[in-house]
Amino acid sequence: MKIKQELLQACIDYANKRIFNYKTEIETIKESIESNDKAGDDDDDSGNGKLFNDLEKNSQHLGDANKMLEILKNISPNSVSDKVIVGSAVKTTTNNFFISVSAGKIDIEDGSYFAISHLSPIGMLLMGKSQGDAIEFNGNKFTIKEVI
């Protein structure tokens, strides 16, 4: 269970960092928009247009990061299953995976894991599989050694 707790915490830290960064960027953009408005430069709206686009993009990314955090909050590191489910740590003959959210490579004491969404192509292949099952991804075959 320690493995899953470490992986889950790393993913939560990743999501919280993204949320913090997007909130900071949104505040910076809002300040720039206010600054432009106070300058009274009515002739040039292109600067604000770009800022509004950036604001919208960052707001969408913030929403995605918040959804990511909600998914993580619903994962119990103490759950046990013989089959791959959301929250499983999966060791294979080639790579190790943590089925959660797409958060990239995570290095913990037990080794390196890739945090992937269950909706990702490889996540969908792994879901429901058990120890000893083999899957093929991008022309590479590998076998599940352990589901934690």
Annotate each PLM feature.
Residues 78-136, 142:
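Non-DNA-binding regulatory cores of transcription-related proteins
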Residues 1-75:
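N-terminal intrinsically disordered, low-complexity, charge/repeat-rich segments that act as generic
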